[in-house]
Amino acid sequence: MYIDTAELCDIYLDQIDVVEPIFSSFGGKSTFFGKITTIKCFENNGLISEILEENGEGRVLLIDGGGAVRRALIDANLAQLAADNGWEGIIVYGAIRQLQQLENINIGIQALAPIPVGSDEQSIGETDVPVNFGGVTFFPDDYVYADLTGIILSQEPLDLEEFDSL
């Protein structure tokens, strides 16, 4: 489905929060949206792998990596796992790696930056907790909408029917 965050802001500005423009798009899909599942972890991705094993249909994984860019939290293997399990997208407040491969995987990915160094594979962190970055607080089960222009957050799903005809 087509979405345009600029148009959504024009229509729903009083109902949404706009994430600061600190993210770049890296995945094979430039637009994505869904109900968020949150993870808070630092320089390790074991918990991320566990969550991505779940059915992700209609869901976006939102990872608070503390803004650290020394180790990548998402790589091609995890992105492919997410795509295979139907996840709509991944937003990483941290780093990712293997950009050439990520471009060819059918999933939306937004992150701060790429780096070639991988993360630890320990399952340390928290899931389904509120996280704060980019000037907004994300709560589990909020809805996020992302495209090349930006990321917006809503407590309720937005009506996207008018975009179906575009």
Curated annotation (Swiss-Prot):
It comes from the Bacteria. One of its GO terms (biological process) is regulation of RNA metabolic process. Its main location: cytoplasm. It holds the Pfam family RraA-like. One of its GO terms (cellular component) is cytoplasm. Keywords: Cytoplasm. InterPro entries: RraA, RraA/RraA-like, RraA/RraA-like_sf, RraA_gpbac. It is found in: Cytoplasm. SUPFAM superfamilies: RraA-like (SSF89562). GO terms for molecular function: endoribonuclease inhibitor activity; enzyme binding. Globally modulates RNA abundance by binding to RNase E (Rne) and regulating its endonucleolytic activity. Can modulate Rne action in a substrate-dependent manner by altering the composition of the degradosome. Modulates RNA-binding and helicase activities of the degradosome. Belongs to the RraA family. Homotrimer. Binds to both RNA-binding sites in the C-terminal region of Rne and to RhlB. This is Regulator of ribonuclease activity A.
